[in-house]
Amino acid sequence: MTAPLPPIAAIATAPGRGGIGVVRVSGPDVRPVMHAICGQALKPRHATYLPFLDGHGKVIDHGLALYFPGPNSYTGEEVLELQGHGGPVVMQMLLTRCLQAGHGIGLRLAEPGEFTRRAFLNDKLDLAQAEAVADLIEASTEAAARSAARSMEGEFSHAIHTLVEKVIHLRMLVEATLDFPEEEIDFLEASDARGQLATIRNDLGNVLAQARQGALLREGLSVVLAGQPNVGKSSLLNALAGAELAIVTPIAGTTRDRVKETIQIEGIPLHIIDTAGLRDEATDEVERIGIERTWDAIRRADIVLHLVDATDYLRHGLSEIDDAIDDRLSGQLPPGAPIVRVVNKIDVAPTVGGMMFSGNRPHVVAANGPNPTEIWISARTGSGIELLRKELLRLVGWQSGNEGTFLARERHLTALRQAQSHLDVAAEQSERQAQALDLFAEELRLAQEHLNSITGEFTSDDLLGTIFTRFCIGK
């Protein structure tokens, strides 16, 4: 039997001034703190308005006090919450008073995420739900918040548990066949083990697809605007953002450093990075540094929009400089990151080379082999901008109207991919003779381990520490 953890306390609301602030205390027995500060016993799960008292009986503040006996609380322990006025000085005075009153029972300041970690350790929520708490707090879009709420309610965990149950059932059949090889009944054949495995793999693929969508909502995409000077990169940033964020002038090289703005497209955060124009020779040291930073941003990009001038492109095709930029982009981008060629300023090139663009009829040329997708736009008039937004979503595989998405992290995607890989190997083993059954069983076991790591049923202490230290202190 493990010893109970020491009681902890922290300010649970965000730093700064506010109408209300909350100090939270959790532990095996918080009643000494309750009696010292509230001066009375509190009725469980009822808000009581009263004065909060210091060590000399003087009033620190008036507010609401709530007492939650364990295990029916957020952490599974006894919890005391003191809700007062949200000034930082008042909150600090109240927290200090809690620590003084709880000195005799070992009360200490909580570490980041420790309240939620205790909820996990006391089986109030699993690891995926615990992470969803932090994701809900940090959500930058409404879609991300709704998806985090679904994960917090257990939708993601339920999907994982369902997969694990199916894997366990299949493992049981394989183990029975291994343990009783002399039996006339072929457990695997009789129960359609291959069909069960195919179902599991299909279900896992669906969960992984949803998790990828959720990861997009959580992390967003880094989209870099690149190209020669004065091709309209800053104008495109302004058009995508719907605001004048970057300075736009006819003078080439106006943008000397990166300008970053986060926008939303169907709830996905897009981190748009406007960069210094790329050319063979920088005119000065400032521009040279700006160009270096442009390539640095490109190396970390999810998507690069390579802007070219419509008039020049229609008259002469891709210039040597733009061709060189394309070649270097291909070598500098992360594997799999797409390049979109954005042909800008079609409003000032309505009839060139026999091709006409009315200004409201942009078109897309789909990617073909090494050639990037082309989208024709006018950042100044807005023509083609909506088409560009849709193309960005298509490139990352976003499915519009996906209300069932749950939020996922990179570690979840990694675990799902690893489980998928083991199930793929298991499928290969199932096609072989009986001597491969032990390998089949081992691949199923490894797949189950990776799935269990998502909900925390098989997770190292080091990983738990990494996850919970990223929370705010009062959570």
Curated annotation (Swiss-Prot):
Q: Where in the cell is it found?
A: Cytoplasm
Gene3D superfamilies listed in its UniProt record: P-loop containing nucleotide triphosphate hydrolases (3.40.50.300), Probable tRNA modification gtpase trme, domain 1 (3.30.1360.120), tRNA modification GTPase MnmE domain 2 (1.20.120.430)
Q: Which cofactors does this gene product need?
A: K(+)
Q: Binding of GTP: at which residues?
A: 230-235, 249-255, 274-277, 378-380
Report the record's Gene Ontology biological process terms: tRNA methylation; tRNA wobble uridine modification
CDD domains recorded: trmE (cd04164), TrmE_N (cd14858)
Please name one Pfam family that this protein belongs to: TrmE_N
Any one GO molecular-function label of the UniProt entry: GTPase activity
Name the positions where Mg(2+) binds.
Answer: S234, T255
Might you give the EC number(s) for this enzyme? 3.6.-.-
The enzyme's first-digit EC class, named in words, is hydrolase
Query: Keyword Transferase: yes or no?
Result: no
Any coiled-coil regions, as ranges: none
The principal location of this protein is cytoplasm
Residues where K(+) binds: N230, T249, I251, T254
Name the GO cellular-component terms: cytosol
Subunit field text: Homodimer. Heterotetramer of two MnmE and two MnmG subunits.
PANTHER family cross-referenced by the UniProt entry: TRNA MODIFICATION GTPASE GTPBP3, TRNA MODIFICATION GTPASE GTPBP3, MITOCHONDRIAL
Which protein is depicted? tRNA modification GTPase MnmE
Q: Which organism is it from?
A: Cupriavidus pinatubonensis (strain JMP 134 / LMG 1197)
Tell me the gene name. mnmE
